[in-house]
From Swiss-Prot:
One of its GO terms (cellular component) is cytoplasm. This is UDP-N-acetylglucosamine 1-carboxyvinyltransferase 1. The keyword Lyase does not apply. Cell wall formation. Adds enolpyruvyl to UDP-N-acetylglucosamine. One of its GO terms (biological process) is peptidoglycan biosynthetic process. It is found in: Cytoplasm. Signal peptide: none annotated. One of its GO terms (molecular function) is UDP-N-acetylglucosamine 1-carboxyvinyltransferase activity. Disulfide bonds: none annotated.
Length: 434
């Protein structure tokens, strides 16, 4: 087992480049299954374990997938199987995104119930509601979701009870080959939705309204492979913005898109952080003293739940009382106990957390509880006295590429070691060939 060891106290400075967006590339890779002609080529693909997992799912289904030099090439023109087994899907809940493409193309999909981060109840009922509205018969049992339709899916009007990103993506992918027109109301508006729509349209789909509350999809008879470059990762960008702020540093986050980060920029500026838009990204300059603020997570364009734990780390250093309210996911405060191990004055009240700052953070041995919590604990370590040791790095590797190396290049005192010996060891990278 590996751990990251960080000694706090260093101000970060320099430039860090943002990778392609994990939450955009996964549905785009799933969507390549829709192409019955040609090969799809995707650029700026981050070298993450989740990308490897969904690529393995596609290979199991019958697609030919090659990954090298931040590029994924998929040929799914041959026959596909309809079942994605538990051994793959358990690793990552985004694997359920193959369901829409399989149902649209083959008329049947059998997918194991998903895994991924253990963040409370993350039901997929909205996905299934959409499939049923388009004429599919859906059954859930024995750890699997079975969906089947006679002939083609039919266009339908679908209202989502909550603007779920995954449901919006899955229904979009199912609808592009459906007979007739599908309208998705109260859909997700995230930049990753727009990116998926752009990819689908480049394949020959007719998707309109992505980025608004209503998406209209006119079904087509076939889709063709295309070339696509994934948008930059706004959550990785936000994480490095917080890293600059928590250390009082001066960092240019190269590739950060201001339009994708409006709510985060607003909260950082409210805390006294300087954010400057430059030609290649965003420069973030941390103040000597941070101000307390209140945050409520909301669907985009509201404050992203995926930045909640990182901002919690930052608010531990702010003067005054702050409150964070989580409205998107249940049980996303598991990292609070780990912050307490670092001397954080923090308590949970229902779906909110109360922080009394500034806290004199102290280095401690802590365990990551999910992907974003892993990054947040490292951020807290950057501002703590002494050494912080973060374990359960499998969570971190699902969403960040060479995270400790990027921080070290900015001046952080950080290394990744084997737990048994604590000898410095370079991160084990996935072999992206084959």
């Amino acid at each position: 087992m590996e751990k990251i060891i960080v000694r706090g106290g260093n101000r970060l400075s320099g430039t860090v480049k943002v990778e392609g967006a994990k939450n955009a590339v996964l549905p785009v890779i799933a969507a390549t299954l829709l192409a019955t002609k040609g090969t799809s080529t995707i650029h700026d693909v981050p070298a993450l374990s989740d990308v490897y997992t969904i690529s393995e799912v596609l290979r199991y289904l019958g697609a030919d997938v090659h990954i090298a030099d931040e590029t994924v090439t998929v040929d799914a023109t041959g026959p596909l199987t309809v079942e994605a087994p538990f051994e793959y899907v358990r690793k990552m809940r985004a694997s359920v995104l193959v369901m829409g493409p399989l149902l649209a193309r083959n008329g049947r999909a059998r997918v194991a119930l998903p895994g991924g981060c253990a963040i409370g109840s993350r039901p997929i009922d909205q996905h299934l509601k959409g499939f049923e509205a388009m004429g599919a018969s859906v059954k859930v049992g024995n750890g699997f979701i079975d969906a089947e339709v006679n002939g083609r899916l039919r266009g339908a009007k679908i209202y989502l009870d909550f603007p779920s990103v995954g449901a919006t993506e899955n229904i979009m992918m199912a609808a592009v080959l459906a007979e007739g027109t599908t309208v998705i109301e109260n859909c997700a508006k995230e930049p990753e939705i727009v990116d998926l729509a752009n990819f689908l349209n480049a394949m020959g789909a007719k998707v309109r309204g992505a980025g608004t509350g209503t998406i209209r999809i006119e079904g087509v008879d076939e889709l063709v492979g295309t070339t696509h470059t994934v948008i930059p990762d706004r959550i990785e960008a936000g994480t490095f913005m917080v890293a600059a702020a928590i250390t009082g540093g001066n960092v240019l986050v190269q590739g950060a898109v201001p339009e994708h980060l409006g709510s985060l920029i607003a909260k950082l500026e409210e805390m006294g952080v300087t954010v400057i838009e430059e030609e290649s990204g965003l420069r973030v300059i941390g103040p000597e003293k941070l101000k307390a603020v209140d945050i409520k997570t909301m669907p985009y364009p509201g404050f992203p739940t995926d930045m909640q734990s990182q901002m919690m780390a930052l608010l531990l250093k702010a003067e005054g009382t702050s409150m964070i309210t989580e409205t998107v996911f249940e049980n996303r405060f598991m990292h609070v106990e780990e912050f307490r191990r670092m001397n954080a004055d923090i308590k949970i009240e229902g779906r909110s957390v109360i922080i009394n700052g500034p806290c004199q953070l102290q280095g401690a041995e802590v365990a990551a509880t999910d992907l974003r919590a892993a990054a947040a604990l490292i951020l807290a370590g950057l501002a703590a006295d002494g050494y912080t040791r973060v374990t359960e790095l499998r969570h971190l590797d699902r969403g960040y590429v060479r995270f400790h190396e990027k921080l070290a290049a900015l001046g952080a005192d950080i290394e990744r070691v084997h737990e048994e010996t604590e000898q410095f060891d370079q991160i084990q990278t996935i072999q992206w060939n084959g």
